[in-house]
Design a protein with these regions (language model features):
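Short, charged/polar micro-motifs that form catalytic or ligand-binding hotspots
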Residues: 1-2, 47, 68, 72
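Short terminal alpha-helical segments
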Residues: 1-33
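Extended, non-membrane alpha-helical segments enriched in charged/polar residues
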Residues: 10, 14-17, 21, 59-66, ...
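Short, charged, amphipathic alpha-helical segments
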Residues: 29-35, 76-80
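Extracellular/periplasmic head regions of type IV pilus-like filament subunits
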Residues: 40-45
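Amphipathic alpha-helical binding modules
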Residues: 61-90
Length: 90
């Protein structure tokens, strides 16, 4: 599969705009810790994951805020942190 980044950006904007139109200015996440499946296991549906790890939403958000405020350089792994937050919101 190949995804156009402009289309991906647009669909994220549409979804976040919809939340704002529903009156949300913030979202509350009551859970903090989650199971993290290693990438090599995540997309292997015919085998059970071997080494689960713990992820933390507050940690992910802190790393993203560092990117937002310029104290950390953008890196592709930021999308992993973002995905954990979007999953929790959804």
């Amino acid at each position: 599969m190949e995804i156009d980044l402009a289309e991906l950006r647009r669909v994220v904007e549409i979804l976040l705009n919809d939340l704002e139109q529903q009156g949300y200015r913030t979202v509350r996440l009551d859970d903090d810790y989650y199971w993290e499946i290693p990438k090599e296991d995540l997309y292997s549906p015919y085998a059970a994951p071997k080494d689960l790890a713990m992820g933390q939403l507050t940690h992910d958000w802190e790393r993203l805020q560092e990117i937002l405020h310029g104290s950390s350089s953008p890196l592709a792994y930021g999308l992993v942190w973002l995905s954990s937050l979007l999953r929790a919101i959804g």
